[in-house]
Amino acid sequence: MKKTLMVAALTGVFATAAHAQSSVTLYGLIDAGITYTNNNVAVAGGDGHSNWKATSGSVNGSRWGLRGAEDLGGGLKAIFTLENGFNIMNGTNGQGGREFGRQAFVGLSSTQFGAVTLGRQYDSVVDFIGPLALTGTQYGGTQFAHPFDNDNLDNTFRVNNSIKYTSANYAGFKLGAMYGFSNEAGGFADNRAYSIGASYNYGPLNIAGAYMQLNNVGSPTNNVNGAVTTDNTPFSAGRQRIFGGGINYAFGPATVGFVFTQTMLDDATSLNNVATNAGNINLGDSHVRFTNYEVNGRYNLTPALSIAGAYTYTDSRIAGEKPKFHQVSLQTAYALSKRTDVYLQGEYQHMTDDDNLPIGATINGVGMSSSSNQVSATVGVRHRF
């Protein structure tokens, strides 16, 4: 159960007018596990070795946050969210060491018209397509992401300096749009971001689509105070475009889904999140494309026991080569209570046509393999509060 704290009980940290009804909710999730990987490299191009490691956030990133609302009357509220990501194994902050790296925003919300918020926020691809892919849910998460999280469905990056609109639900339809400012005088388009998305829900059916574009993220002309910073994004490129859509349909305790996304990068200079001591992988100022197809499903065997799985095929173009990625991912989870569960999940990834590239199979979150194949398995526990 989430713990709702009255603002007055926070000893002056949060103040409120006597006539307004206000609240602050403290919430969080801790995900800790042990992960085995059959092949990891310390340096790109180096020898691969099996690896056992203690992990944080193998499924869902560990986090704690504060969510607040003040009733302004007439269906209007002032709202805010401050959310910190952290590594439970060593206590450090995630998202480049930011205090509130996962989310930090404030705004106004109307039951009739929707919400407008400003701050560090998720984009429309994450908001609308993410919940339809297993990487965007509790049924797969980090390690189920598409190669290098190229479409950001696993929230590798957030958008700074952003203003965001999310509509109310109109007979099952929802719309959203976001713009992230570059904050640079004379360089309005230098490291800016914008996105738009929509969804429709009717009973067991859920359909969504979205588009996002980033300009000059991590490029030689990058504005480091702009919308997306290099330490959080998978790629450095002159322009990155992501679009796609998905569909889910529920049959009683079962849900099946399909997701399509495509990521295109112009003037791509490096791949940033492969977790090797050699640092970033040089992409040679090339055109890069990833086209992802995911088929997924989940089933509640009992109220406490669930199983889930996904197959992802990714057709890509990287530095003139045409590697293809196949990944099969499976998870089972058992709820010990409403807030605590244990899980076991595994992934197998096979990469083809990679002979002339300095990369191998790379299951998201576990690091690169020295070969075209990689297997990973994690046993873990999650606690929500």
Model-flagged regions — what are they?
Residues 1-21:
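Gram-negative bacterial Sec-dependent N-terminal signal peptides
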Residues 48-62, 99-102, 157-161, 190-194, ...:
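Residues that define the transmembrane beta-barrel architecture of outer-membrane proteins
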Residues 35-41, 87-91, 179-186, 191-192, ...:
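Sequence/structural signature of outer-membrane beta-barrel proteins
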Residues 25-27, 77-79, 115-117, 174-176, ...:
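Residue-level detector of the transmembrane beta-barrel scaffold of outer-membrane proteins
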Residues 22-36, 52-182, 190-192, 199-210, ...:
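Outer membrane beta-barrel
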Residues 336, 371-385:
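Outer-membrane beta-barrel "beta-signal"
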Residues 9, 13, 65-67, 105-108, ...:
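Outer-membrane beta-barrel architecture
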Residues 197-327:
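Detector for outer-membrane/organellar transmembrane beta-barrel domains
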